């Protein structure tokens, strides 16, 4: 088994790290750079930063904090938020990001994925997918502009179909953000993640629902994901990353130490 990755997620809004529940009611957690440094020191394998309102407000990530993060940490990090062109992606990579993630802009223009891959290589192109389980139709659907509840909208895509589409177009990784589980700390959506794992040939990162160390163990053992992303359990000090890695090792799940 390849080493599994533990990835703290930092949602950014107006220059601060925030956290909501099911993509709503965000509260301020802290400052970007100190939190990034803390997680790097605690043993995170990489970090993901989402400027959650950038796409909905038709702007792009603030490059100033990207460069400050790059100066402080020595682990890979990925940035997302409003990146809709080669030039914007190039700027963020030049300021120190190791990967760029695209979500809503790719839904608006799927050809963006291929263009980014052609320019920078598959290895640094991550696609974020905000997936919502619709009980009425018993289906998983993709939503767009989820960082601003007033702008959030449904798309034409079923989650499985969009996962297949973004792979065809050249993404290097997929982060599956399960909206129903987000922030409630009741566990990852193992059923949905297992379904997506079957059709996902690139690294798959689980996002949404972590509340205990056992939840991480289950998502690696049952859903076979490559990495687990979490926010509130790390922000609130519920789980220490080094202790989590020790726990996973005791259950024969390798991580990077």
UniProtKB/Swiss-Prot annotation:
InterPro entries: Aldolase_TIM, His_biosynth, HisF, IGPS_HisA/HisF, RibuloseP-bd_barrel. SUPFAM superfamilies: Ribulose-phoshate binding barrel. It catalyses: 5-[(5-phospho-1-deoxy-D-ribulos-1-ylimino)methylamino]-1-(5-phospho-beta-D-ribosyl)imidazole-4-carboxamide + L-glutamine = D-erythro-1-(imidazol-4-yl)glycerol 3-phosphate + 5-amino-1-(5-phospho-beta-D-ribosyl)imidazole-4-carboxamide + L-glutamate + H(+). Pathway: Amino-acid biosynthesis; L-histidine biosynthesis; L-histidine from 5-phospho-alpha-D-ribose 1-diphosphate: step 5/9. One of its GO terms (molecular function) is imidazoleglycerol-phosphate synthase activity. It is found in: Cytoplasm. Keywords: Amino-acid biosynthesis, Cytoplasm, Histidine biosynthesis, Lyase. Its EC number is 4.3.2.10. GO terms for cellular component: cytoplasm. GO terms for biological process: L-histidine biosynthetic process. The active site is at residues 11, 130. It comes from the Bacteria. IGPS catalyzes the conversion of PRFAR and glutamine to IGP, AICAR and glutamate. The HisF subunit catalyzes the cyclization activity that produces IGP and AICAR from PRFAR using the ammonia provided by the HisH subunit. Belongs to the HisA/HisF family. Heterodimer of HisH and HisF. This is Imidazole glycerol phosphate synthase subunit HisF. It comes from Shewanella woodyi (strain ATCC 51908 / MS32). The gene is hisF.
């Amino acid at each position: 088994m390849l080493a599994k990755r533990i990835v703290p997620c930092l949602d950014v809004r107006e220059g601060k790290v925030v956290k909501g529940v099911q993509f709503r009611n965000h509260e301020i957690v802290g400052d970007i750079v100190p939190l990034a440094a803390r997680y790097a020191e605690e043993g995170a394998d990489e970090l993901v930063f989402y400027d959650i309102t950038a796409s909905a407000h038709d702007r792009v990530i603030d490059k100033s904090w990207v460069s400050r993060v790059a100066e402080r940490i020595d682990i890979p990090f990925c940035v997302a938020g409003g990146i809709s062109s080669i030039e914007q992606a190039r700027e963020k990579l030049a300021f120190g990001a190791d990967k760029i993630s695209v979500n809503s802009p790719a839904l608006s223009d799927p050809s963006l994925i291929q263009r980014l891959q052609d320019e920078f290589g598959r290895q640094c192109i991550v696609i974020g997918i905000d997936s919502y389980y619709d009980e009425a139709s018993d289906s998983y659907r993709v939503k767009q502009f989820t960082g601003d509840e007033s702008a959030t909208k449904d798309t034409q895509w079923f989650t499985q179909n969009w996962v297949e589409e973004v792979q065809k177009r050249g993404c290097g990784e997929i982060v599956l953000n399960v909206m129903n589980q987000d922030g409630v700390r009741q566990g990852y959506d193992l059923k949905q993640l297992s379904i997506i794992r079957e059709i996902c040939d690139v690294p798959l990162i689980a996002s949404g629902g972590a509340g205990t160390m056992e939840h991480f163990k289950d998502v690696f053992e049952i859903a076979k994901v490559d990495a687990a992303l979490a926010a509130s359990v790390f922000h609130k000090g519920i789980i220490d990353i080094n202790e989590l890695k020790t726990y996973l090792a005791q259950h024969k799940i390798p991580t990077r130490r």
